[in-house]
Each structure stands twice: as C-alpha cells, then as structure tokens.
C-alpha cells in the first residue's frame, strides 16, 4: 500500500464574495486527486484543505483555484498575510483616468479618457466573468460586464467608467474589511509556536516532531509550544487567549500548562503530555473551524431563496428591454437604463452575507473570551434560552472538597484499616470527592494502594465499589446502600451543617463508616445568577447531592434559584431537562462531570466546563467553557442576542439598499453607478456592522503583571474580588471611585514593586543557616489610592477615603534566621541541614487588637502564594519570592504568622475603604505614627506593615 503524508493547508482566497462561490470551489477540489477533505469559510475568505502532499502540493491547489480567477495564495503556518493592503493597479489607473475625464467640460476630447478608464479597470472583472461562464455560472462579474457593455453602447462613457471604478475599489474595501474581521480568529488559530527547545540538549525541533514524555524548556517571555506538566521551576502564565483568564496564573511543579499560553516570568521545564495535533489549542482551533463552516437555520433559508432570486431578477430585467422594444415605445433608452439597474441588483451578495458574517464575528468573539461554541445553530439557539439548569458540584461550587470528619462505625474495623480500604478504592475514581478522601488518608499517614483493588466499578449518581483484602467495599451516598444489599440507611448523628456532603462506607452489608466533606460556591456565581435574572432567564439547580447541601448553596446565592432539585440520578436530571423544555421553552444545562453527560445531551444547549471538566462532558457539550468562571455564561447569552440583532440589521440594510435603488429607478432616475455602489456597498456595510460584535461593549482597564525581581521580595497583595476573596475567575469587581488611579479599584492595573532594601554584604549563604546572617527583604503593599503622600514622623493619616491621606506603598524588612533545633520540623533550610525557619511575626502598627492570620503550613516554593485569612471578610494573598534565601528555596516553610499591633490606632476608616478591604480597613493597613529608617514609608492611611521577623 502506498504511503501517505496528510497535511492541513490554509489558503486565502480573495475571490470569494459570498456563498455563491462555494460550489465552484467544491467542484475544483473534488476533481483533484489527493484531497481528503476541505472546508470553505466565506466570511474570512479561507479555504482549508487536508491533502496528501505526496500526490498534491499546495501550489497545485493554488494554481487550480487561480485558473478560476479566485485570487488564491498559500497562508503560511496558519497566519494571515494580507496582500491587498493597497488597491490594485487596475483600480488606481482607472480612478486617475476617470478623474481626468471630468475635464471634458473644459476640453471635450477628455471625454474619451472615460473609455480608457473602463479599459484599464475592466480586466480583473472580465477575467472572472469568463471563468464563471466557462463553468456555466452567473455571478456579479458577468452582470457588471454586461452592464458596462450596454452603457458604452449607449455612449454613456462616464457612467460606465464610474461603474468599473466603484466596483473594483469597493471589492478592495470589502476584502480589507473581511481581513479585519478574520484577523482575530487567525491569531487564535496560530497561538502555539512551531518550534520547541529540548531541555537536555538545547536543540530546537519542530513541535510536530515532539513525542509525549519529552522534556522541553520554556524561558520567560516565550509561548508554551505544547501541553504538558511542569517538571522543574515556577512561573506565571498568561492564559487569556485560551481561557479568557484576566490575570496571570501561577505555575509550580506538577502544574498543567497549555500550548499557546505565555510564560511571563521564570524558567520552567515541561514534560509533554500530548502530541501537537492533540493539544487543547489544536482541538480548540478545529472546533472553531467546524463552527465557522456550519450554517444557521436563517442562513440556510436565505441561501435557498437566493437560488431563485438571481434568475428571477435577470428575467425581469430582460422583460424591461424586450417588452418596450416590442411595443416600439419612443423612450427605449430609459427602459434599457432601468433594465440595467435591475440587472445589477440581481446579485444578492449583501443579503447572503448578512447571516454568516455576523455569526463568524460572534463565534470569534466567543472563542477569544474563553467560550467555544461548536456550531452556528447553537449560537442561534442560545439567543432563545428561557431557563438555565446548573449542576452543583464542580459547577456552582468549586469541587475542591475537604474531609471534615471520618468515623468508623464498626468495632471490628479500625479507622486505619477502613481508611486504607476507602482511599485505595477512591484512588481509582476521578471524582473530586475521591481526591479529597485520598488526600485526607495521606495526611494521617495512610498510603492508598490502588493496585490492591479488584473489580472496581463506578455507579453514576450513587458511588463506587471495589474489592480489597477480600473485603467488598461500597462508597457513596445513600443510594449505595441498595448496592451493598441494605434496604435502608440507619439514622446516624452526622454533621450536615454548612451544606456538608455525607459519604457512606459499607463493607459487605455492614455500614462500617461515614464521613463528611465541605465545599464552597465559586466566586462570581451570585453575579452570574443576577445577570441571568436581568435577562429574564429562570435558573434551576439539579444535583445528586443531599438536600441540605443543595439548600445551603441556595442560601449562599441569596435564593437566586427558581428550581432546586437534589439527590438526583443522571437519568433523573435528563428527565427534568425534558420537562423544563416542555414547560419553559429552550433550555440550557451547565455541568462538568460524567453524571451530567445525559442532561447535557438532552438540553437544547449543553454547556460543559472544558479544561476542568471530564472528557465526556466536553464532547457532549454544545458550548465549552474553557475556564471555571461561569460569569461567561450570561456573557455568551448576551453575545448570542447581539448576534441575532446584527443579523436582522444586516438583512434590513441589504433589502433597504436594493429597494431604494429600484424605487429611485422606477421613479424616473435609473442610475447604474448607484446600483453598483449599492450592491458592493451593501456587502461592505454588512461586514462593518457585524464587526461591531468583536468590540468590547464594556471597556476594562489594562491588565498588568507583577514585575519579577532577582532579589528576595515578599509581596503582600490585597485581593479584591467576590466576597470569598477568590482570584480564580481573574475578574475584579467594577468599582467606580473618583479617588482611585486609572487601573485601580476594580480594574486590573497593579503598581510596580519597589526596589529591595540594601542586603547584607556577605552573600555566601544569603544569610541562611550556617552563618545565621540576616537578609533584608522588601515587602510592597499594593493599594488603589489616588496619590502617594509622604508624611513626616509622628503624623497620622486616615484611610484611602480621606481626601489628602492615601496609602500608596509599604516597605518593610524581613529578617530570617535558622535555628539549630527547630521544633517539629523534619527538613532543613539550606543544603538539607536541620535548620528551618518555623515562625514568623508580623508587627503591624496602629491596630487596637492583634489580628490573627492563618496562612497554612508546608513548604512555600519560590513564586508560590497563599491566601491570608484576616478577621472578618478580608483576605490577602502573600506572594513568596525567596531567590536570595537558600540554595534550595523549596525548603523554606512557613508554619505560622502572627500580627502584633500597638495602641496608636485612631480609627478613621471611610465606608469606601471598608468596601475595598473588608469589614475593617485597618486590618489591611494601619495608621502611620511610628518612626522610620533612612527612607519614609510612602503608604499612609490604613495600615503600614512595619516588620516581619522570621526566626
């Protein structure tokens, strides 16, 4: 069997005006050997061909397309190289000659320059007309040639020249507009670079040649070429182009990175987990291509009508000449002019483009916002949605469970043994609850052994089963009891407050254990619900969790749900979706897991959580949410409604323009040049109107990135987001404050970190362990105040709300030392020695009372961050950069952090500042009333951090 080498090639085909050229391209490509499949995307004037390069080259395809005068050229590596930046020489020369012909009023021989203008500009139109006739097709080029010929025959040379010039220049403008409309999508499809660097050798290779489990290197500023897992190093990654995430995402060892995202800082090595063609960005591009090539119901209707429109108009125009000629009317020239106006109006390009261009722009906007809509029909249906149903776990809630309590109910089974059986069985499940149980087991020194589990089974909506050490173990909700052979679940005193999820463990037919898990709602969910309500859309929650957990989520969201159904099996969800479709109308279902797949498939629109969701959910969903921010859902519905309005506007523009020209002609003013201008001008207006979908209706501030520093810097940053303080969605609240600087207070601009204070002169060990020297470290507190105020010693200032006293930046020093015998710590600080910083004190001036901050325990890698919980609602993120501390920065561990305060606080916090920083803004900043070192603190008002002592 002959070998094959299949390649996907992209071609820019500027000769595509509307869908009427698609059959021509199909006939050309179908007649060529080596073509496996192809698609034609009319709005972007793109042809995508999968072909065998051993049989058919790209240049052979270009040659075949250009024989039909389609102006095709190869697009290199999926990028758009627009070649018509300027009008063609034919149009330029024709325009100059036409302009000179108007001097005929001064010197009559100049009128012949109009004929020269026709000759100069007609060639490309004539060539396309001949190519169309050769294939027995009637298009706008043939109609224009006939019109120009008839006009010259009537000695209207100037009008003929105007027709030729307007047609050529308008086509150029249309191609420019089409390029602008498709440029965003082309950049999306060419996100991933074509080359990668092998970490071990430094060799640069083609991405297509990379195999899985190859370790590659990615430097700061480079685009990650392929999906993988970080092996070494850490960095921040800009995932905006892929997920719509507004802020950089920190990546540490074992973090997943995606092709097409940008490494903003740091050096990482990545172990590849997919081939180039199987990367998320490649699948994303394929889905977008398929969606662009699909048609809405409206578009199919218009295309069907256009098949009859052109022949009917041509027949009418012939009648306008034939009937007056047969009747020998005295003003035959008027009727010929009228017939030519009608003839030029026979091309319905503007009407045909009205739907696909608007759809194309909407799909492009969605894709660049982290929403993949798999087809044009789904976009049209999305605009009609009346009710949205949500799964709870992993969709409304984070799906990041924590085991709060685990009990053994059998005297014959120890807690250690039960936890071993449960965690070993759960380690074979992909459910987020399973991961929480496994983590809990390891935290109490129980190591699961999944290889010891036999006959593992999953029961969707109920639980799992596995056989281990001869024991049959069932784990799940109440329904799992029937699988274990029990008819009912005994009443057990289990804490279900706070919406905890209860899990039951059966060993054989005996209820051997019970555990509860806690989960929390995602940030932004309440906002998403509010926006859906404002659109007149009802909301339902369908969950397999217990009623208590479901109602707790309902309470957290302010009773936003119109319908709440709990303890549902997958088939129950599907039946409820059918019921909602009958009673409410078009229904959307949002889910992320295996249990949601039937409901996603049943709904009119299935929306799956893409990158985080299961593979099956992603395949089942009609729309893929690339991030976990469900605020994208109301955005998608708004976009679909805007696209629907644009389609209506485009149709109205097309019909109105044609109707106006015909009405003018029948009123006694048959202007042929106006008819041509209306035809090509309508196409241009339709494209420009549709491009408004690509613009952001609500402008946001510029995104800014934290500057990395080679020195040891600790950044304490205020998190302003949802009430939960969650930065996961990457979107800050839109707060308008006249005292705020541009980009602050809810926008995305951050201030630059200050330079570190002068460090110790001895850097042999950076002040760590063996020498016990101290390093100076700068802490920068970011704020949203209008202007820095440098006050002298002993001066007090108010919060940000004060007119003249605004916190700006905070500089403190961190002292680090190592103890020879740290209490309760196993790992050393540097070089593996048993010297570990184990306690930190934060002295914060101007607090009435000490505020406890819990930042968790465990190693803090360079570049890692942790959430600091203040008293009340406020939260802060502590960013750790420890380049200068240890040769092995991963050994630096933070075990506790205490806040000290003095009694100088004169609370003067304004309500606006409390809005920014929680229930008490003095927890974020303190009043300045303390002495300084050689440099003043340029951050006054609410809370100057004074000293962090690492002992």
From Swiss-Prot:
Pfam families the UniProt entry points to? E1-E2_ATPase, Hydrolase
* Ranges annotated as spanning the membrane: 84-105, 109-128, 136-156, 158-178, 305-327, 336-353, 648-667, 672-691
Kindly report the protein's main subcellular placement as a broad class.
membrane
Q: What membrane topology is given?
A: Multi-pass membrane protein
The EC number of this protein is: 7.2.2.12, 7.2.2.21
Q: Which InterPro entries match?
A: ATPase_P-typ_cyto_dom_N, ATPase_P-typ_P_site, ATPase_P-typ_TM_dom_sf, ATPase_P-typ_transduc_dom_A_sf, Cation_Transport_ATPase_IB, HAD-like_sf, HAD_sf, HMA_dom
**What are the positions of the active site?**
391
Region annotated Disordered sits at 841-866
- Which UniProt keywords are given for this protein, alphabetically ordered? ATP-binding, Cadmium, Cell membrane, Magnesium, Membrane, Metal-binding, Nucleotide-binding, Translocase, Transmembrane, Transmembrane helix, Zinc
**Where does the record say this protein resides?**
Cell membrane
Q: Which reaction does it catalyse?
A: Zn(2+)(in) + ATP + H2O = Zn(2+)(out) + ADP + phosphate + H(+); Cd(2+)(in) + ATP + H2O = Cd(2+)(out) + ADP + phosphate + H(+)
PROSITE patterns named among the record's database cross-references: ATPASE_E1_E2 (PS00154), HMA_2 (PS50846)
Biased composition range(s): Basic and acidic residues: 841-851
User: Which residues belong to any copy of the HMA domain?
Assistant: 7-73
EC main group: translocase
Family of the protein in this entry: Belongs to the cation transport ATPase (P-type) (TC 3.A.3) family. Type IB subfamily.
What does the UniProt record say this protein does? Plays an important role in zinc transport and homeostasis. Could also be involved in cadmium detoxification.
Q: What is this protein called?
A: Cadmium/zinc-transporting ATPase HMA2
Which species is this UniProt entry from?
Arabidopsis thaliana
**Taxonomic placement:** Eukaryota, Viridiplantae, Streptophyta, Embryophyta, Tracheophyta
């Amino acid at each position: 069997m002959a070998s094959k080498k299949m390649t996907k090639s992209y071609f820019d085909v500027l000769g595509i005006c509307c869908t009427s050229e698609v059959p021509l391209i199909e006939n050309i490509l179908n007649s060529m050997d080596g073509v496996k499949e192809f698609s034609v995307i009319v709005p972007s004037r793109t042809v995508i061909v999968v072909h065998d390069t051993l049989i058919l080259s790209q240049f052979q395809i270009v040659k075949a397309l250009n024989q039909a005068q389609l102006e095709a050229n190869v697009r290199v590596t999926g990028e758009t190289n627009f070649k018509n930046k300027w009008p063609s020489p034919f149009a330029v020369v024709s325009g100059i000659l036409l302009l000179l012909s108007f001097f005929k009023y001064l010197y009559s021989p100049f009128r012949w320059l109009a004929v020269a203008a026709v000759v100069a500009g007609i060639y490309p139109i004539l060539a396309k007309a001949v190519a169309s006739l050769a294939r027995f097709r009637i298009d706008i080029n043939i109609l224009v040639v006939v019109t120009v010929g008839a006009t010259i025959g009537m000695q209207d040379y100037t009008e003929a020249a105007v027709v030729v010039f307007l047609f050529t220049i308008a086509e150029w403008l249309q191609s420019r507009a089409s390029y602008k409309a498709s440029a965003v999508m082309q950049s999306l499809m060419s996100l991933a670079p074509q080359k990668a660097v092998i970490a071990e050798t430094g060799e640069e290779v083609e991405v297509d040649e990379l195999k899985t489990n190859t370790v590659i290197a990615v430097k700061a500023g480079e685009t990650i070429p392929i999906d993988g897992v970080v092996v070494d190093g850490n960095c921040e990654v800009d995932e905006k182009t892929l997920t719509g995430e507004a802020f950089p995402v920190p990546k540490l060892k074992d973090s997943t990175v995606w092709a097409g995202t940008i490494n903003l800082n740091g050096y990482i090595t990545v172990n590849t987990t997919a081939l180039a063609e199987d990367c998320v960005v490649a699948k994303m591009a394929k889905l977008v291509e398929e969606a662009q090539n699909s048609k809405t119901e409206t578009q199919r209707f218009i295309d069907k009508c256009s098949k009859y429109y052109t022949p009917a108009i041509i027949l009418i125009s012939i009648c306008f000449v034939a009937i007056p000629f047969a009747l020998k009317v005295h003003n035959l020239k008027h009727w010929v002019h009228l017939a030519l106006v009608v003839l030029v109006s026979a091309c319905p390009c503007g009407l045909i483009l009205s739907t696909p261009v608007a759809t194309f722009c909407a799909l492009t906007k969605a894709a660049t916002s982290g929403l993949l809509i798999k087809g044009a029909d789904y976009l049209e249906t999305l605009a009609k949605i009346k009710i949205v149903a949500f799964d709870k776990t992993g969709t409304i809630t984070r799906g990041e469970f924590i085991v709060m309590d685990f009990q053994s109910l059998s005297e014959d089974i120890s807690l250690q043994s039960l936890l071993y059986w449960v965690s070993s069985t759960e380690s074979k499940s992909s459910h987020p609850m399973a991961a929480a149980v496994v983590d809990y087991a390891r935290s109490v020194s129980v190591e699961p052994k999944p290889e010891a589990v036999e006959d593992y089974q999953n029961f969707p909506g109920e639980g799992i089963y596995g056989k281990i050490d001869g024991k049959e173990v069932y784990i799940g909700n109440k329904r799992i009891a029937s699988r274990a052979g029990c008819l009912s679940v005994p009443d057990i005193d289990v804490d279900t407050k706070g919406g905890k999820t209860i899990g039951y463990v059966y060993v054989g037919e005996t209820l051997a254990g019970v555990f509860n898990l806690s989960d929390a709602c995602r940030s932004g969910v309440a906002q998403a619900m509010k926006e859906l309500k404002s659109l007149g859309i009802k909301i339902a929650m369908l969950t397999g969790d217990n009623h208590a957990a479901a109602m707790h989520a309902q309470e957290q969201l302010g009773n936003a749900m119109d319908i709440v159904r709990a303890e549902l099996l997958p088939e129950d969800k599907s039946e409820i979706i059918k019921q909602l479709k009958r009673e409410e109308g078009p229904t959307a279902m949002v889910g992320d897991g295996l249990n949601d797949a039937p409901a996603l498939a049943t709904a009119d629109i299935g929306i799956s959580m893409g990158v985080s969701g299961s593979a099956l959910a992603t395949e089942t969903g009609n729309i893929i949410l690339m991030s976990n921010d469900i605020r994208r859902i109301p955005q998608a519905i708004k976009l679909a409604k805007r696209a629907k309005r644009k389609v209506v506007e485009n149709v109205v523009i097309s019909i109105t323009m044609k109707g106006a020209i015909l009405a003018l002609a029948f009123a006694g003013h048959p202007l042929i040049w106006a008819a041509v201008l209306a035809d090509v001008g309508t196409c241009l207006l339709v494209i420009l109107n549709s491009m408004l979908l690509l613009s952001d209706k609500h402008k946001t501030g510029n995104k800014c990135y934290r500057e990395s520093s080679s020195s040891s810097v600790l950044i304490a940053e205020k998190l302003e987001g949802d009430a939960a303080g969650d930065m996961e969605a990457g979107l800050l609240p839109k707060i308008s404050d006249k005292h705020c600087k541009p980009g602050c207070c809810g926008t995305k601009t951050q201030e630059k970190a200050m330079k570190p204070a002068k460090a110790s002169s001895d850097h042999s060990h950076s002040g760590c362990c063996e020498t016990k020297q101290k390093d100076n470290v700068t802490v920068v507190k970011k704020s949203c105040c209008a202007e820095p105020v440098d006050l002298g010693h002993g001066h007090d200032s108010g919060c940000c709300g004060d007119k003249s006293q605004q916190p700006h930046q905070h500089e403190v020093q961190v002292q680090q030392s190592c103890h020879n015998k740290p209490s309760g710590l196993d790992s050393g600080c540097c070089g593996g020695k048993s010297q570990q910083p184990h306690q930190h004190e934060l002295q914060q001036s101007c607090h009435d009372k000490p505020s406890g901050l819990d930042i968790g325990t465990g190693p803090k890698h360079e570049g890692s961050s942790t959430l600091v919980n203040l008293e009340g609602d406020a939260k802060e993120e502590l960013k750790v950069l420890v380049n200068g501390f240890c040769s092995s920065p991963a050994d630096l561990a933070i075990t506790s952090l205490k806040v000290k305060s003095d009694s100088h606080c004169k609370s003067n916090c304004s309500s606006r500042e409390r809005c920014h920083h929680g229930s008490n803004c003095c927890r974020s900043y303190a009043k300045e009333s303390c002495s300084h070192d050689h440099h003043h603190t340029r951050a006054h008002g609410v809370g100057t951090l004074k000293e962090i002592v690492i002992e």
